[in-house]
Structures are given as C-alpha cells and as structure tokens.
C-alpha cells in the first residue's frame, strides 16, 4: 500500500513505478535456482513406494516416497557427485543408481545394500549402463566397455551373489536395443551414417543373426511383446518422419502399428501388454498417446491442462502410473495417477513458492524465412515489458548437436534472461531433428555455413518485431550451439553485438580426432556428417573452426567451460580465449574445475548464469 501512496506523490516516480509494474517481478538467480530438478520415478514391485532423483540439496540425490503415507526419505547424501536412480531390483527391492566423477561421463552402476553403496561395474575410465532384468529377475543386464574402451559388451550380474558373466562380446560397435522376455533374443543396431542404420535380431542360443532393417533408412528398437512373438521398432524409410512397425520373429512379416505427421520418438508395451505408450515429437512439444490394447481406446489423463506430459511409467500391476510433466513456466514435476479411480497425486514441488508463474515467459513456436526461402522453426520467449515504446534487447539461442532441437519446456537460463528483459529466439536451424529427415540432412558437411545463415536470418526476423531494439541483438549457445556462437562472432563479425559460448567446439579437427573411445558406435555417422578429420575433409574442418580465424572477431565474447568435459576439451576454450585476447577482443572466461559437458551443480549454475546476465547487461543492454 505504501508503495502506491508514494507513487502518487510524484509524477516522475509514478511513471517509474508504472514501468516496474508492467515488467512484472524480477527474480534473482538464487530465487530461480531454488527451483528443483527431478528425474526418474520408479515403483517398487508392489507399487507401494516410488524412488526418484532430485537436486534439492544442490546435487542430485535419491529419494523414496511411501505412497500410502506420502512420507519421503532421502536415501543418499552426496555432496559432490550426482546420483541418478535407475530403479529397484525386482527381486530384492534394493535401489540401483548411476553416477560418474566430476562430470567425466564414465558412469558406473551402484547397488544400495545395507545402507552402503556397492560399485557393480568397477574399473578406471570405464562406462556402464543398465539394460534390463532376466525373466527370473535374479540377474541384471548391463553394458560396459571395461574389456575394450571402444565397444560395449553385454553382461549380466546376479543381484544376490554379484557374480558377473559376459553374455555377448561386441566387436563391431553395436548399440543394444532390446533383450527378449525369454532371455533368448538380442536386438542391436549399427550406425552406418546419419541417414542409415542396420538392425539385427541375434539368437543367443543358436548364434544366428537376422537383419530386421530391410531398407536403407534409420531404425530404432522399441522392444518385444510379452510372448516374444513380435519385435517393435521405429523407422523413417517410407516418409519424412519416424513411425512404429512390428516384425514377426517367426514369419518375418511386418505391420504398421502407428503413424502420424511427426516423429514417433519411442514406444513400449506395459508388462502384461494391456497398454501401449507412444511418445511423439510434435512441433517441438511432446505428445503422449496411451492406448488400451483390449479395446483400442485412448487413455485420457485428467489434471494436466497446460502441461506437456514428457513420460509415463507403469507399475507392474498396470494400475498406477508415474507421470512426468512440465511447461515453459514450470520445471518438470513428478505425479502418480491411479487408472482405477483417476486419483492424481503430486510427488514433487519443484517450482519455488516465491515464484509466480505469471511472471515467467511462455515459449511460442514461430517460423521465419531464411536466406533461401526455407522456413525455419523457432521458439520465441518475450519479456513482459516488451512493447513498441519499451523495446528490449534480444539473444539468438542455438541448441546443441549437431542435430539437436530446442523444444518447449522449462529452461532456467532462458527464464532468467527473459525475466531480466531479454527476448530469446531459440532457433531450430536446418539440420535440427524433429522436422523430417530432409530438413535434418540439410547441414551435412555444411556446418557453420547455411545453418549459421539461418541464425543470422533469425536476427533479421527479430529486428522486424516492433518491441525489439534492433541494434542490441547477441547470440548464445552451448556445445554445438557454442560453436555456432563463435562461428557467428568470427565469420559474421558485424552481425551480433555479443556472443556467449558455453563449452562450444572451436577446433573441429582436434575435437573429431579426440572424441571419447566409447563413441565408436557413432564415429562413422559423425565423420560422414561433419567430415573425416584424418582425410582431406580436415581442410574444410580447419576453415570452419573459429580458433584459426580469431583475428576476425570484433565484439565482446564470454566463454564458459568445464575442466572435466570429455566431449569439448578444456584446451578448446583455453586456446580460443587466448587467441581472441591476442587480437584485443574483450573476453570473459569462466572455468569450472568440477564440471563436465554441462553444469550439473546448482552452485555452478548460479555463478555461471549470473555472470552471463552481468556480461550481456554490460556489453549489450
């Protein structure tokens, strides 16, 4: 009340007050990062408990909820490393989780037994992940590159004795898709190029291998039915988008199961095959379809208006679901939903109670024409105070990849920047996934060229919006988006007033020559897309690498990097910063000693995001 009385005493103060109110509430980075993130959400065998991971302590730990009493217990107390829950052992009801060291991506699997963690997959510089359980539930399947860092072999471990046996030795960089319910069949894929995969059905008993992929296309395995009669997979060989097919193991007959005008991302059958879950990437939003196979009816979930359901996980009795849902204004939340009575319970409360969602920005899908007339999809986040009279600066946001996609959902850095007066245009440049295989392939061996022009034309589109200050537009991106940021500042030095490079590639020759050994299954695909750094392609890779053209940079840049990043090595950013500074460029450099390819800890995000805002405030706003 006093605020409004004071405003009335002075016309000038009234104007200032009105401006403040029109902007909505500005939140500090500490307030925004008091939001929590959660992942997982797995039922115990009797569906009485649910476990999930949350970073409410600053790093991800594991929490168990008694669904009858709603009582929650913190099961781990890590201070440094993030623990990501993988589920319960169906036999012993013990918790399995995954963790690496300092973001190095060498994740191991751990079992919590008698309140102590046991490393099930020990070894230096090795990586492992859970793949499923044997039919008798006594053994856990997992893949590990402990024998050869380039290849992941298939193992099973007895969950009681912890004895480990190799099931399949992998010498061709196969990627495991599925293991049959009867433990006899294994389906694995082999990446040939960005537009071609092979998929095989392997009989572990007879050692016979049959190719499921019958056309040159992309294939992704989606699992067996409960009787191991049919295998399900997605492919795009008869169109632009992925659709769901079935393959009869006995006859080899193929049938279409589900097709729409967007990519079917994944699909699975519940334990008794009562329901089929289908996830669709529909214009940068997730759409979930759950079909009751008894009558082919759709399951409609009540209480999720305004939210995108990202995923669902069924209890073994198929009566209760874990649902993960989010929106642009809300970080993902975990719910349980009872199909017998439509009872909905919210498990997490990840949005800080001090934040009013109405003060946050809603992502809106827009499209604009690029230099050659190609329609480029993007997501626009507009500040509350942006008007024709109160123009705002803007940033072009470039996603990772190559081949990634900016999607509708909550991103704390975007919300922080928009909340403090910056419009964000998250560009899905040519080469992005989700818009058909033709669009996806348009940047092959053309990276940093036409896709970069798409970003520049995104800037031109922003300049046409009446609420944008057309002289104050920068560019920001992480990983491949960090490369695009540096490419823009290097090869289009007059286009963007500032650039924020978050662990971006700046020397493609070195990066492609030093990719982690465990990426062997994707190496050929990456080389065919980007170019082989050990061939004449290295000339082009050199030419598009910002490091070697630092003399072109004119405007201020900021670089953020994790010292343990196995994908984009620290030396990439070190050398880029040194080169830019040698030509008199203003550079801010923030290095996290305990981070990898991404900043998992809240303290890293708070420091990094606040310094990004300070940088753009001082150099752009």
Regions found by a protein language model. Give the residues of each.
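Extracellular/periplasmic ectodomains of large secreted or surface enzymes and adhesion receptors
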Residues: 24, 33, 268-278, 290-302, ...
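Conserved beta-propeller blade repeats
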Residues: 35-51, 80-98, 109, 124-143, ...
């Amino acid at each position: 009340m006093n605020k409004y009385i004071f405003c009335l005493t002075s016309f000038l103060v009234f104007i200032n007050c009105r401006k403040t109110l029109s902007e909505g509430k500005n939140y500090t980075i500490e307030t925004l990062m008091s939001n929590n993130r959660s992942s997982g959400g797995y039922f115990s065998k009797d569906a009485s408990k649910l476990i999930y991971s949350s970073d409410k302590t600053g790093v991800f730990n594991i929490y168990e909820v008694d669904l009858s009493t709603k009582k929650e217990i913190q099961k781990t107390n890590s201070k440094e490393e993030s623990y990501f829950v993988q589920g319960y052992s169906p036999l012993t009801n013990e918790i399995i989780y995954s963790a690496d060291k300092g973001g190095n991506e060498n994740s191991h699997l751990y079992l919590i037994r008698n309140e102590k963690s046991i490393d099930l997959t020990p070894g230096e510089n090795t990586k492992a992940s859970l793949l499923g359980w044997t039919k008798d539930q006594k053994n856990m399947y997992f893949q590990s590159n402990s024998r050869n860092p380039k290849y992941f072999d298939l193992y099973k471990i007895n969950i009681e004795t912890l004895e480990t046996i190799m099931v399949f030795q992998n010498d061709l960089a196969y990627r495991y898709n599925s293991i049959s319910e009867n433990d006899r069949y294994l389906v694995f894929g082999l990446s040939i190029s960005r537009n071609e995969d092979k998929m095989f059905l392997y009989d572990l008993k007879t050692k016979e291998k049959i190719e499921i992929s019958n056309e040159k296309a992309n294939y992704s395995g989606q699992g067996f039915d409960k009787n191991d009669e049919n295998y399900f997979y997605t492919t795009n060989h008869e169109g632009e988008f992925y659709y769901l097919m079935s393959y009869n193991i006995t006859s080899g007959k193929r049938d279409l199961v589900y097709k729409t005008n967007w990519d079917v991302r994944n699909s699975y059958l519940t334990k008794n095959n009562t329901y089929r879950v289908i996830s669709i990437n529909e214009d940068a939003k997730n759409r979930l379809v759950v079909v009751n196979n008894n009558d082919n009816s759709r399951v409609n979930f009540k209480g999720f208006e305004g939210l995108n359901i990202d995923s669902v996980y069924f209890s073994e009795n198929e009566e209760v679901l874990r649902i993960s849902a989010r929106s642009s204004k809300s970080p993902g939340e975990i719910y349980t939903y009872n199909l017998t009575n439509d009872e909905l319970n919210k498990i997490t409360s990840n949005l800080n109670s001090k934040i009013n969602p109405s003060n946050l920005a809603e992502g809106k899908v827009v499209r604009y024409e690029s230099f050659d007339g190609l329609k480029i999809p993007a997501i626009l986040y507009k500040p509350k105070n942006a008007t024709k009279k109160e123009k705002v600066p803007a940033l072009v946001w470039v996603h990772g990849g190559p081949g990634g996609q900016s999607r509708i959902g909550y991103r704390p850095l975007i919300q922080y920047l928009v909340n403090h007066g910056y419009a964000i245009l998250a560009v899905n440049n040519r080469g992005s996934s989700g818009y058909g295989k033709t669009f996806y392939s348009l940047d092959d061996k053309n990276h940093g060229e036409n896709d970069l022009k798409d970003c520049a034309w995104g800037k031109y589109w922003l300049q046409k919006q009446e609420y944008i200050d057309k002289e104050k537009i920068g560019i920001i991106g992480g990983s491949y988006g960090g490369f695009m940021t540096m490419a823009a500042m290097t090869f289009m030095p007059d286009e963007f007033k500032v650039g924020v490079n978050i662990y971006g590639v700046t020397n493609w020759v070195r990066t492609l020559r030093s990719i982690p050994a465990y990426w062997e299954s994707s190496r050929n695909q990456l080389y065919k897309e980007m170019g082989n750094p050990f061939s004449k392609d290295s000339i082009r890779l050199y030419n598009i690498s910002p490091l070697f053209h630092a003399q072109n940079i004119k405007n201020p840049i900021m670089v953020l990097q994790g010292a343990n990043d196995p994908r984009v090595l620290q030396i990439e950013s070190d050398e880029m910063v040194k080169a830019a500074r040698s030509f008199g460029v203003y550079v801010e450099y923030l290095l996290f000693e305990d981070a990898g390819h991404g900043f998992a800890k809240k303290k890293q995000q708070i420091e990094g995001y606040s310094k990004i805002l300070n940088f753009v405030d001082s150099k752009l706003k």
